[in-house]
Regions:
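Nucleic-acid enzyme cleavage-core boundary/entry regions
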Residues: 1-175, 188-319
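Catalytic metal-binding/acid-base residues of hydrolase active sites
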Residues: 184
Length: 319
């Protein structure tokens, strides 16, 4: 999150007293989360309004709030750098100015695999692109890879994931996938789908590895754990409900077990998601081995930094 909010007026506009109050509330929410290190998507801002009882949880209200925020940003009343779209990103070739910059950035970004000495290997998978920033902020301090499924994972992506995870199993690590999704008919089923298809793609390769590692059942080597959104979390945090989509082919089974309401993962506070993810990561982690690996990495980083600081001497052949 950028340190200072960036207000830029492109289209002057005046607002009614009611909309002024909404804009003030938007800025208060954005500043609160910026201070904690988070930027928000439009949907996360909307759920903050719903959770605070400011608007009802209705599609029309989401559309209305989005229109007000859009006008307010153009009028220079809501900062441009506090609301993000995590689903659209520019891709291209990375550039540096010269070798000095390259070696300096290499030293800064140097990172070894801190899980290489662990008995387990953890990844965090989330249903929605919009939450990848929150998930990343929780995972990065622990050197945990994370992944946005974008709904049901494609066949290609899940097969590639299975092949990647098998490399960890081959290194004698048990793989744990921590999965987060909506509490609705499809969101609940996605956890099962990931587990089933990973098992399908990995099963033939896992048979010899299972024997080698002394396990009797292959599923113990790659495990998918759903950590959110679950019924106990709905009861504890009371996120705003949505009507279950009756057009979903899984709706009948879902309604028989959970009723006619469903809940979006986005409705949980980013801080709640952060704490939840980090708690589950730490449960699978050997803290002593992690600390040792981190110290070794920092020692190597220091050597690289010293090389970067004296790069011109090295490049010119100086002692």
């Amino acid at each position: 999150v950028t340190a200072e909010p960036l207000f830029i007026e492109y289209t002057p506009k005046s607002f009614s007293a009611e909309r002024e109050a909404i804009i003030e509330q938007v800025n208060e929410i954005l500043e609160q989360y910026a201070e904690a290190g988070y930027d928000l998507t439009l949907r996360q801002v909307y759920y903050q309004f719903v959770a605070r009882g400011l608007i009802p949880n209705q599609a029309a209200e989401y559309k209305r709030l989005g229109a007000i925020i859009n006008d307010a940003r153009l009028a220079g009343r809501v900062p441009w750098n506090r609301i993000v779209d995590r689903t659209r990103n520019l891709q291209g070739v990375y550039h540096v100015a010269d070798a000095q910059q390259a070696i300096t950035e290499a030293a800064r970004d140097f990172h070894t695999d801190l899980w290489a000495t662990q008995k387990k290997r953890v990844e965090v998978w989330v249903e929605k692109d919009a939450l990848i920033g929150v998930v990343g902020q929780a995972c990065q301090p622990w050197d945990v890879n994370y992944f946005s499924c974008r709904g049901y994972c494609s066949q290609s992506e899940l097969w590639a994931a299975a092949m990647r995870l098998l490399k960890y199993v081959g290194a004698r690590q048990e793989v744990i996938i921590l999965h987060l999704g909506d509490h609705d008919p499809s969101g609940i089923d996605m956890t099962r789908d990931i587990s089933d298809r990973l098992s399908l793609f990995a099963s033939e390769h896992l048979k010899p590895l299972t024997k080698l590692m002394g396990f009797h059942q292959t599923h113990r080597l790659i495990t998918v754990k759903r950590i959110a959104l679950n019924a106990d979390q709905i009861e504890r945090y009371d996120p705003p409900p949505n009507p279950t989509k009756l057009t979903d082919s899984r709706a009948k089974g879902y309604i028989s077990e959970y009723g006619r309401e469903s809940w979006e993962l986005d409705a949980l506070e980013p801080t709640v998601l952060n704490d939840l993810i980090q708690t589950h990561i730490k449960r699978e982690l050997d803290g002593h081995a992690f600390a040792e690996a981190y110290r070794a990495m920092e020692k190597e980083r220091k050597r690289l930094t010293e090389t970067a600081e004296h790069w011109h001497e090295t490049a010119s052949g100086g002692a």
